[in-house]
Regions:
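Mid-to-C-terminal polyanion-binding domains and interfaces
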Residues: 75, 79, 315-319, 326-359, ...
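Catalytic domains of riboflavin
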Residues: 1-4, 484
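Active-site cavity-forming subdomains of large catalytic enzyme subunits
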Residues: 134-203, 207-216, 226, 243
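Histidine-centered active-site/metal-ligand motif
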Residues: 172-173, 365, 424, 517
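Hydrophobic helix-and-loop "lid/oligomerization" segment in the mid-to-C-terminal part
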Residues: 2, 10-11, 15-143, 163-164, ...
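A short acidic, amphipathic alpha-helical/loop segment
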Residues: 155-159, 357, 372, 481
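A generic local secondary-structure boundary/capping motif
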Residues: 157, 194-197, 275-276, 374-375, ...
């Protein structure tokens, strides 16, 4: 299916700001536009963006309830109370549990007073459970701290309070209009909150708690630095924004991982075949993060926490091997379920017409539903919900969005059909009784049909282009400037550029085992620039037209090809078309 191309449009004021920024910073005009698109309007903001400083982290006490939470936690430490840290089973939850555990342990709180609980994905389900509260009661716990969960746990928190336990919630999910009766609720998305940055991960909220605790106990900020590696993992894997405060966390966290990683991260790096000092966002997304996530998907998230709090090499090595095996099992399972799910859609014309794809098979493993939903959303360019049997009469579902569709809002609109749900615009999870599924499917499809952005060419994938370049602007100098935006991630993706009126410079050819890819050697139509190299996955069908010297346009990311013994600028082509096809491809935004 051909993609449409949308070039980001800038207002007159934005163009003026972009031009002024680029001029003052000595950058290409396109870089000025990229900065403005990321909310950067002044020279000072640009300096902070390019050189994030820990001194620019926000005051934790600007968060509602922080003083109450810090005082309660400090009292628990001083009086040697039993504390239970309760976290979700994904990377954000397990890193948040490990962060609090490691810091409290470092504050000389004996481990006999320090406990953690991760719900079992299969037996407990998502969120705070009464089983978890009862576990805390058996341990004599007087303070529970939930991380990456708890913002909707009204019944469970009430139950804990009735049994003499105080409760601090550290969560980043969108709350309802009313809040549960906790001792303190730390959540930057609270409606009454004035904290300057709303896009913290669950682990990020936990970090703000220990930042406040360190301030209360007159401890230097340096005591918090070893925890930054956990923040990097959570921010990357939970796909929260990496602008603002998260950019500070992730920039300094990557420096830490590449200079002084913990023993846990060291062994994960070995399993992922990542050289010391070479950890980047890609290696976190595809090597470290999936291994940590695999325990909660295939067995129990507590196995990940055991690794992340390990202090000795023997424990770290053993636990990392366990997670690696879970990850291998997860890969096999998600590939199998993905094949089955794709076959269901492709064999059902009715499913292919739906604005939102919903698939249910009782035998599918709950642990891979989110991965499968993401794969299908990418393939079919629509939001996808995957459901399977959970326990008793209940089904569990996981969804991923596409095309700007707000999946959380769609599920919330049908929430009276559900037992519980949670998530955000891009991803969500839910629990539903099996007999309510038909009504839920009907209503969420009606909601999807009613949403304007899904009714206008809903099935056409769209490639978002950050800026159009003149062929003469495509250079190693621009690549070096683009790399100043690193680290890349949510809200700061690697820029996609477009240029037009390119022609073959000799050497363009189909490559690959099945000759399905395209290796490009190109110049502008007037041959005024030195030939550029490009590589396009799956676009070899254009080779005959290009080698006949037909003009073409292309969308691409800039990268360095370090193919030994030489290094050269390469355009990683996202899409291309003949110049004659361009008017049909381009749309405005």
């Amino acid at each position: 299916m051909s993609q449409s191309w949308e070039i980001r449009q800038y207002t007159t004021d934005e163009e003026t700001q972009a031009c002024e920024l680029a001029t003052r910073l000595g950058l290409f005009p396109a870089m000025g536009r990229l900065l403005v698109a990321r909310g950067i309007r002044t020279y000072e903001e640009a300096q902070s963006f390019f050189s994030p400083r820990l001194e620019e982290l926000h005051d934790p006490f600007a968060m509602e309830d922080m003083l109450v939470a810090v005082e309660r936690l400090n009292r628990a430490i001083e009086q040697r109370e039993h504390i239970l840290i309760y976290g979700d089973y994904d990377v954000d939850g397990t890193t948040a549990v490990a962060l609090l555990y490691r810091y409290l342990r470092a504050q000389c709180l004996p481990e006999e007073y320090l406990h953690y609980y991760i719900p079992d994905r299969y037996d407990d389900g998502y969120g705070i459970t009464l089983q978890g509260i009862d576990y805390a009661r058996q341990l004599g716990v007087s303070l529970i701290i939930s991380v990456d969960t708890g913002i909707k746990a009204f019944e469970e928190i009430t139950y804990a309070r009735e049994h003499g336990m105080d409760f601090i919630v550290c969560d980043h999910h969108t709350p309802d209009d009313s809040l549960p009766p906790a001792t303190a609720i730390l959540n930057p998305k609270r409606h009454d909150n004035h904290y300057p940055f709303t896009e913290l991960s669950g682990c990020g909220v936990a970090f703000k708690l220990v930042q406040g605790l360190a301030s209360r106990r007159n401890l230097p900020f340096e005591t918090l630095l070893p925890l930054l590696e956990l923040l990097v993992l959570s921010i990357a894997q939970d796909r929260v924004s990496i602008l603002g405060e998260n950019r500070i966390f992730i920039s300094h966290g990557l420096q830490l991982i590449n200079s002084h990683p913990s023993v846990a991260i060291t062994y994960l790096m070995r399993l992922g075949k990542i050289q010391p000092g070479r950890v980047d966002m890609a290696s976190i997304y595809y090597e470290l993060g999936p291994r940590i996530n695999a325990a909660g998907r295939m067995a129990h998230g507590a196995e990940s926490v055991k690794l992340l709090i390990a202090e000795d090499a023997a424990t770290a090595e053993a636990q990392s091997q366990i997670l690696d095996e879970y990850n291998r099992q997860r890969q096999e399972l998600d590939q199998q379920v993905t094949r089955e799910a794709i076959a269901l859609v492709e064999s059902d014309p009715q499913l292919q017409k739906q604005r939102l794809i919903i698939l249910y098979r009782p035998e599918w493993n709950k642990g891979v539903m989110g991965i499968v939903a993401a794969r299908l959303a990418d393939r079919f360019h629509r939001p996808v919900l995957i459901l399977s049997h959970s326990t008793g009469d209940f089904l569990a579902g996981s969804g991923r969005s596409a095309g700007g569709f707000d999946l959380y809002q769609a599920i919330q609109a049908c929430s009276d059909c559900l037992e519980n749900f949670g998530g955000h615009i891009f991803a969500a999870g839910l629990t539903i009784r099996e007999d309510r599924l038909p009504e839920f499917m009907r209503r969420i499809q009606e909601y999807a049909d009613s949403v304007e952005q899904t009714t206008s060419q809903p099935f056409t994938p769209t490639l978002q282009i950050d800026a159009e370049l003149k062929p003469s602007e495509v250079s190693r100098t621009l690549l070096r400037q683009v790399e100043m935006l690193y680290p890349f991630g949510t809200d700061n993706e690697r820029p996609i550029f477009m240029t037009r009126n390119m022609r073959d410079a000799g050497g363009t050819r189909a490559v690959g085992k099945a000759l399905q890819h395209l290796s490009l050697r190109m110049t502008d139509s007037y041959q005024r620039i030195r030939p550029l190299h490009g590589f396009a996955l799956g676009l070899a069908r254009y080779a005959p037209e290009i080698t006949r010297h037909n003009a073409f346009a292309l969308c691409f990311e800039l990268e360095e090809n370090n193919f030994y013994p030489q290094s050269f600028l390469q355009l990683r082509v996202k899409d291309l078309c003949l110049e004659s096809e361009l008017p049909e491809r381009l749309t405005d935004r």
